[in-house]
Swiss-Prot record:
Function, as annotated: Protects cells and enzymes from oxidative damage, by catalyzing the reduction of hydrogen peroxide, lipid peroxides and organic hydroperoxide, by glutathione.
GO biological process: response to oxidative stress
Tissues with expression: Expressed in leaves, stems, flowers, green siliques and seeds.
UniProt-listed Enzyme Commission number(s): 1.11.1.12
Gene name of the record: GPX1
Origin: domain of life: Eukaryota
InterPro entries, A to Z: Glutathione_peroxidase (IPR000889), GPX_AS (IPR029759), GPX_CS (IPR029760), Thioredoxin-like_sf (IPR036249), Thioredoxin_domain (IPR013766)
Name of protein: Phospholipid hydroperoxide glutathione peroxidase 1, chloroplastic
Signal peptide: none
Location(s), subcellular: Plastid, Chloroplast
Organism: Arabidopsis thaliana
One Gene Ontology CC term in the entry: chloroplast stroma
An example molecular function term from Gene Ontology annotations: phospholipid-hydroperoxide glutathione peroxidase activity
């Protein structure tokens, strides 16, 4: 026999389902009732099961699964805990960006979105870099093979054609078995309606001054559309 009870909390309404039809089964699980809204502070996320963005801290995903020691450790991890390689192959500890707002983007040189995104990213970086804003660009060749060049070719393209001054890093995979650890972290902390996979070039993650993922934007969201969200975090 399956029974269901409903309870409410500040995080939403949950139904507790109990299956007592089998003698040796006492499994229960929570089914959250989600209210969907948009905006940087009110975004309901669904990733690897049901999850909610906490009203107390919009950058934290409150999941229905048991909060284990491992889950707690993962929740406490930030972008600042990672070390990546730059476009020249040198290690860069991301804790150097503590106290700064970051926009992390997977870029490509031969995409239909390349020109508009690089131009707008360069404009935003020039406008806000002295206020504590950083853009971290990660080249990726997984979408239509649109970033086939070497690191030196990618660097020359971005810096010569678009005058990009923001940091560009080593080419990475953002999906699949060879996914870069930084992208595993980004996706697990901001699954959202986009799901676990990066969908295309120029998907964007906005990071607050503490290294927490605040928002995720699809490739079709232009950098200029994110400007107000950047301003809010810089002012915080």
């Amino acid at each position: 026999m399956v029974s269901m009870t409903t309870s409410s909390s500040s995080y939403g309404t949950f139904s507790t389902v109990v299956n007592s039809s089998r003698p040796n089964s006492s499994a229960t699980f929570l089914v959250p009732s989600l209210k969907f809204s948009t905006g940087i502070s009110n975004f309901a996320n669904l990733s690897n099961g049901f999850s909610l963005k906490s009203p107390i801290n919009p950058g934290f995903l409150f999941k229905s699964r048991p909060f284990t020691v491992q889950a707690r450790a993962a929740a406490e991890k930030t972008v600042h805990d990672f070390t990546v390689k730059d476009i020249d192959g040198k290690d860069v500890a991301l804790n150097k960006f503590k106290g700064k707002v970051m926009l992390i983007v997977n870029v490509a040189s031969r995409c239909g979105l390349t020109s508009s995104n690089y131009s707008e990213l360069s404009h935003l970086y020039e406008k806000y870099k002295t206020q504590g804003f950083e853009i971290l660009a990660f080249p990726c060749n997984q979408f239509g093979f649109q970033e086939p060049g070497s690191n030196s070719e990618i660097k020359q393209f971005a810096c010569t054609r678009f005058k990009a001054e923001f940091p560009i890093f080593d080419k990475v995979d953002v999906n699949g078995p060879s996914t870069a650890p930084i992208y595993e972290f980004l996706k697990s902390n901001a699954g959202g309606f986009l799901g676990g996979l990066i969908k295309w070039n120029f998907e964007k993650f906005l990071i607050d001054k503490k290294g927490k993922v605040v928002e995720r934007y699809p490739p079709t969201t232009s950098p200029f559309q994110i400007e107000k969200d950047i301003q809010k975090l810089l002012a915080a």
